[in-house]
Swiss-Prot record:
Uppermost EC category: translocase
Entry-linked Pfam families: NADHdh
Gene Ontology biological process: aerobic respiration
This enzyme's EC code(s): 7.1.1.-
Protein name according to UniProt: NADH-quinone oxidoreductase subunit H
């Protein structure tokens, strides 16, 4: 066929890879909700979901059926357009951010020269989902959760970018593949240990995960900005949170733990094992740490994490200048 040119074939292959990768990310996010409940049960000395299917294996299917058939109610007192837009942003922002992550030397969605900046942009966009949900719900608890989210995001996105500048300076590029290639002999977690620690803390905060789940604190805000949502709109928020965990875990692997590099096993297996480990760490943190007060969260970001990040950046610059 004359219209099937090599350029078109390459475009179709690229689109096919992108669809497969993003579908796998969404599936991992959905299955992580099931895995989290089982692991929390293990950590707390109980069984977790074990009634639907063999050993609870079909619990995710039951949850999906329940979500699909729940009434998707939109209260009359809400701003309906923004109320509907918020869960869409929550679901898509971190999913699109995963597009810059190279899974293997040949598998990835987008190879951008501004990869890290693109992630920071999408992480900043994710907070608009919370702000829109809190404002459009016309509920005081939702609004309080949204205000908390905006303040927390401003605090922690200041140093989530600075924590990555040491990695960028060492690799000499914002491109994710270049950063992975620069770790072929030494992972960045060793020279950039403090950068990794602050990025991991900020990553948990970006995902609004415990102990940084102040915007949706159940005991204080009755589930915060989620309070007026039901049905699939609530489901989009729910799955979007787990997609954020998958994305941040993959970025930790890519930026600090060598990406797909590793001995003996294929690159994809190494990437999956490393990412799965950090996804489990998110669950372990939820099971083991208490939720601090809101003022303690803010003070920790500005008084502890930001100075550490700046000192790490200065030390990295000094080492690079000395070696030059």
């Amino acid at each position: 066929m004359s219209w099937l040119t090599p350029e078109l074939i390459e475009i179709l292959i690229t689109v096919g890879k992108a669809v497969v990768i993003l579908l796998v990310v969404v599936t991992c996010g959905a299955f992580m909700s099931m895995g989290e409940r089982r692991l929390l049960g293990l950590f707390q000395g109980r069984y977790g979901p074990n009634r639907v299917g063999w050993g609870g294996s079909l619990q995710l299917v039951a949850d999906m059926i329940k979500m699909f058939f729940k009434e998707d109610w939109v209260p009359n007192f809400t701003d309906k357009v923004i109320f509907t837009l918020a869960p869409m942003i929550a679901f898509t922002s971190m999913l699109i951010a995963f597009a810059i992550v190279p899974i293997t030397p040949t598998w990835g969605v987008a190879d951008l020269n501004i990869g890290i900046l693109f992630f920071l942009m999408m992480a900043g966009l994710a907070v608009y989902a919370v702000l829109f949900a809190g404002w459009a719900s016309n509920n005081k608890y939702s609004l309080l959760g949204a205000v908390r989210a905006s303040a927390q995001t401003v605090s922690y996105e200041v140093f989530i970018g600075l924590s990555l500048m040491g990695v960028v300076a060492q690799a000499g590029s914002f491109n994710m593949r270049d950063i992975v290639d620069s770790q072929e002999h030494l992972w960045n977690v060793i020279p950039q240990f403090f950068g990794f620690i602050t990025f991991a803390i900020a990553g948990v905060a970006v995902c609004h995960r415990h102990p940084f789940d102040q915007p949706e604190a159940e005991q204080e805000l009755a589930d915060g900005y989620h309070i007026e949502y039901s049905g699939m709109k609530f489901g989009l928020f729910f799955v979007g949170e787990y997609i954020g965990i998958v994305t941040v875990s993959a970025l930790m692997v890519t930026l600090f733990f060598g990406g797909w590099h590793g001995p003996f096993l294929p690159p994809f297996v190494w990437f999956a094992l490393k990412t799965g480990f950090f996804m489990m760490m998110f669950i372990l943190i939820r099971a083991s740490l208490p939720r601090p007060r809101y003022d303690q969260v803010m003070a920790f970001g500005w008084k502890v994490c930001l100075p550490i990040t700046l000192l790490n950046l200065l030390a990295t610059a000094a080492v690079i200048l000395y070696n030059a």
